[in-house]
Amino acid sequence: MMRYLYERLKTFRGGANFAMPGHKGRVAFDFDLSDDWTEVTGADNLLNPKDVIASAQEEIAAAYGVDKSVLIPAGSTTGVKLALYLAAEPGDKILIQRNSHLSLFHAAVELGLELVYLPAPVDEATGLFAGVDPADVEDALAADPAIAAVFLTSPDYFGGGLRLKEIADIVHERKKVLIVDEAHGAHWAFTPLAPYSATTCADYTVQSLHKTMAALTGAALLHMNGPVDERKLLKGMGLFLSTSPSYLLMLSSEYAVAAGKAFDWRKLLSYRKHMEESLPTIDVAKERGNLIACADPMKFLFHVPGYRGDEVVSLLAEKGIYLEMGDAYYALAILSPYNSEEDVERLIRGLKALLEREEDMAPPKGAYPKTEAVYSPREAFFMETERLPLRDAKDRVAAENLTPYPPGIPIVTYGERITEEVIRAVEGSKNAIGFEDGKVTVIKSAW
């Protein structure tokens, strides 16, 4: 049998990695395959922890300064579902950002949740989401007291953090629950950005340790503050997690938190400063208005004049330099403690080698089109469907997410109408999941 995946991944060895995972293939873990166990006597059980796993979770909670932490060796996607299961009941309304991760929309299908959208302002200078206005949260909760919880993403994929403490005060004053997808900020609690971490103010915080820290891909955490229904928590873990959770993922989670606490994260600031000073003609996205409280310097989002971002990604990959993502305008490099000075120099040399083109392009006018929800995600998911060419699907209702990946934010989700704006956004994306062979899935017409 040909080992296709293995042979392909071997070609990436020796590259300069500015993508996930945060360990960059360089962490000398102090565990190995001999530690890959299941729930044998003495190894405890994640689905009913009473011994070493319970102790590990207590230690992690103390490191993050939260009341309780749970190991999630199944990615933040599972952490999101578990948090929503704990915070809401079927039929409940959840106030969300439209630029939420795909996992939230999947959770809405599985749990039967109704989604209420916050306004999604866009920064005119960068074309990126401009954050969440605390006043919009207050207005939405006042207008609809039936909303059970607020679900926010902070930091976002590009490293922008929300004004979470202000928002948390508003949410808690109205006796609602605040859930934060902090998948991209598991390291924040150990950096100068600690005051902006959701762990300081959210009821539930979901983190992906592997994105920026020394954990294996799929290692995640769910943090909780305040009272926890232990019976419901165990029930939810049994529902969403495998009965054979990976001990290697859990071991890497322990390792990552310990290493994250010990690392001097300010070291990465010098890398970032050197990159910006060495590349004066590169357009680096920074400020996004006063609704973004802080920006993570580990996320180096930039535009090379004259080039699409996905073009930059491809050209650098030919040189063994791997970026996290590229779209029609931007490219993204993610720094971590395991990038070397030589990595940074290779990236700088690679970008300098790209010849500037005389004709440049304008930043995107808006990150995602405005959409109209016709059905709830769960209703749309189970309706009869058909596949149509994208252009023929105008004004029809989507039965699947159309999602550029990365970052995994749907252009349109289950139950939303496909507009001309949606069509143009999908056409502009080269890697939208759900858009195969030029066709999309829509709810079947009665006519």
Residue positions per predicted region:
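N-terminal "arm"/small-domain region of PLP-dependent enzymes with the aminotransferase-like
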Residues: 1-51, 407
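Conserved PLP-enzyme active-site core in the AAT-like
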Residues: 2-8, 27, 63-66, 76-286
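Short, glycine-/Ser/Thr-/acidic-enriched flexible segments
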Residues: 25, 157, 211-212, 227-229, ...
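Conserved N-terminal alpha-helix of the aminotransferase class I/II PLP-enzyme fold
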Residues: 33-78, 99
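Short glycine-rich or small-residue beta-strand-to-loop segments that form or flank ligand, phosphate
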Residues: 43, 70-72, 150-153, 332-334
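A short linear hydrophobic-aromatic micro-motif
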Residues: 68-70, 207, 320-324
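Conserved C-terminal alpha-helix-loop-beta "cap" of PLP-dependent enzymes
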Residues: 280-435
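Charge-dense polyanion-binding interfaces
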Residues: 432-447
